[in-house]
Amino acid sequence: MSVNMEELRHQVMINQFVLAAGCAADQAKQLLQAAHWQFETALSAFFQESNVPSAQHHPHMMCTPSNTPATPPNFPDALAMFSKLRTSESLQNSSSPAASNACSPPGNFNPYWASSPPNQQPVWLPPASPTTHLHHHHHHPQPVWPPNSQPTGGPQKAMAAMDGQR
């Protein structure tokens, strides 16, 4: 790999580490270099260090994980990252039409799974008007609950298996 590609790969890994761990880029770079650019190894080292209550490992800064279920994200850092995203997106939008579609649903997106159209009743109500009948001609597969269950006697097989265990 060329030197530029190697530098780019390292920079991407540093950015991913900052996002995953919520720490400063210089600390991410130090940990990644110490782990010979093994992302998981460096991440493990970071979280093990941050769980040690003493500050003797890093007396200048104690960088704890900020985006875990137990701790809220570090809002100044998050806001700074969002402002960087906004400026980079505005640059991309002028040259790349695909960037403007990034937040749009894909072309095969089916809005019926989330809500019913205003002129039709929801599918789960019994048909009470002719407009509901029109929905059945779209030939969308009807949702099956639970997922992956087949209408061919799945519950009976499960009951037979449970009866056999008793």
From Swiss-Prot:
Signal peptide: none annotated. Residues 120-166 are annotated as: Disordered. InterPro entries: UBA-like_sf, UBA_8, UBALD1/2. It comes from the Eukaryota. CDD domains: UBA_F100B_like. Belongs to the UBALD family. PANTHER family: UBA-LIKE DOMAIN-CONTAINING PROTEIN 2. This is UBA-like domain-containing protein 2. It comes from Xenopus tropicalis. The lineage of its organism: Eukaryota, Metazoa, Chordata, Craniata, Vertebrata.
